[in-house]
């Protein structure tokens, strides 16, 4: 079969890591030909994939034009389908404003559209709610086949989008974590005698990183002897930190996938204050790197981490601070989280299993499409 891997809409966030990981596995499916449409953010993969005889890459950033949103047509992508006699399209993550007229599997990772009971909804205004309704419509009209990374989300999506088929393919850490020779040691953190909490993430509103300001305030007042810093992978200008608390924070900007393992090596705790997720690769990444996890006491987090994390009440800065302090000072407890994490990893699809499942789903829906024709 001829299959388009559509990553033309990916600019930042966890989708970049998933697309990178999936594309690196395509060489194993020699019975299929892949046309991989890379956004400029993923353009570096052209060199990585050039040795694979069954993979062709093109770099293209799909424009978010009114015409494309309304009609679902994109001349460049439609021409790719026609010229390469494509059987099916796998959009790594939507929403896909392009609506191909062939079998189409679309990844769904917009928890905001389904987890309506999240504390996040107390933080957003009318503008955000309208945006979510547009996303909801774009997803619903873009495909008849979806996959999510969490069975709980799959169930919610199936109920919400009646008449569609929803598959579950869990996320994992990128294969570069198992290839130490490819780790980039470019992000060396300043020396620090204390506990380093790492959060690898784009500064999305639902990640709730502002809680760290209140965590720092609490720790500076209640536990002044406890030395801790928070390493964040976005720019300082994205989050206003009071001058008297700046020593708690280390902003290092965006990082490449290959730079992440070394950051984990330099850290003591993975802290993730997110209020909603379908999945976040930072959980399995921390498990793989042997780091204890501190995260929110919410259903999706429990479903992904089980006994491998220390949980705190989602919007309670004091609880977050106490959880960090407990993990940092109770070495036996921290080690138990790490050991539980190694066991929890076995429950996820590995990067190879994820690729196998996605290609198998494409084979199924493309075959079904041929039969219907």
Identify what each model region corresponds to.
Residues 77, 81, 262-267:
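Short alpha-helical donor nucleotide-sugar binding micro-motif in glycosyltransferases
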Residues 292-295:
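Short hydrophobic beta-strand element within catalytic cores of glycosyltransferases
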Residues 238-261:
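Nucleotide-activated donor-binding/catalytic signature segment of Leloir-type glycosyltransferases, i.e.
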Residues 125-146:
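Membrane-proximal helix-turn-helix segments that form the acceptor-binding/catalytic region
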Residues 4, 189-207, 213-216:
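Conserved donor-binding/catalytic core segment of Leloir-type glycosyltransferases
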Residues 275:
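Aromatic "clamp/platform" in nucleotide-sugar-dependent glycosyltransferases that forms part
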Residues 310-317, 326-331:
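Conserved acidic donor-binding segment of nucleotide-sugar-dependent glycosyltransferases
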Residues 332-363:
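A charged, aromatic-enriched C-terminal amphipathic alpha-helix characteristic of glycosyltransferases
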């Amino acid at each position: 079969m001829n299959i388009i891997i559509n990553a033309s809409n990916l600019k930042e966030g966890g989708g970049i890591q998933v697309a990178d990981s999936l594309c690196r596995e395509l060489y194993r499916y020699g019975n299929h030909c892949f046309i991989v449409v890379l956004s400029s953010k993923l353009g570096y993969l052209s060199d990585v994939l050039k040795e694979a005889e069954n993979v062709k890459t093109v770099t293209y950033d799909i424009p978010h034009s009114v015409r494309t949103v309304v009609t679902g047509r994109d001349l460049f992508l439609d021409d790719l389908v026609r010229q390469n006699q494509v059987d099916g399209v796998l959009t790594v993550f939507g929403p896909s404003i392009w609506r191909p007229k062939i079998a189409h599997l679309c990844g769904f990772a917009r928890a905001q559209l389904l987890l309506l009971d999240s504390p996040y909804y107390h933080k957003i205004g009318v503008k955000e709610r309208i945006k979510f309704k547009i996303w909801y419509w774009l997803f619903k009209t873009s495909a008849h086949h979806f996959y999510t990374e969490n069975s709980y989300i799959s169930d919610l999506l199936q109920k919400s989008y009646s008449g569609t088929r929803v598959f579950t393919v869990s996320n994992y850490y990128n294969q570069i974590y198992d290839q130490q020779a490819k780790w980039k040691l470019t992000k060396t953190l300043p020396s620090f005698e204390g506990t380093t909490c790492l959060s690898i993430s784009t500064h999305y509103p639902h990640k709730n990183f502002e809680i760290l300001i209140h965590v720092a305030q609490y720790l500076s007042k209640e536990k002044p002897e406890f030395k801790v810093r928070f390493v964040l992978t976005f720019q300082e200008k994205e989050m206003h930190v009071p001058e008297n608390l700046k020593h708690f924070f280390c902003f290092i900007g965006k990082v490449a996938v290959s730079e992440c393992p070394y950051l984990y090596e330099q850290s003591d705790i993975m802290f993730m204050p997110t209020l909603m997720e379908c999945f976040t690769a930072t959980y399995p990444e921390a498990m793989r790197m042997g780091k204890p996890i501190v995260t929110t006491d919410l259903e999706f987090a429990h479903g992904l981490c089980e006994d491998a994390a220390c949980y705190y009440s989602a919007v309670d800065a004091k609880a977050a601070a106490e959880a960090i302090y407990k993990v940092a000072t109770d070495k036996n407890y921290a080690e138990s989280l790490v050991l539980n994490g190694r066991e929890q990893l076995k429950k996820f699809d590995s990067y190879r299993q994820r690729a196998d499942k996605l290609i198998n789903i494409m084979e199924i829906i493309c075959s079904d499409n041929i039969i219907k024709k």
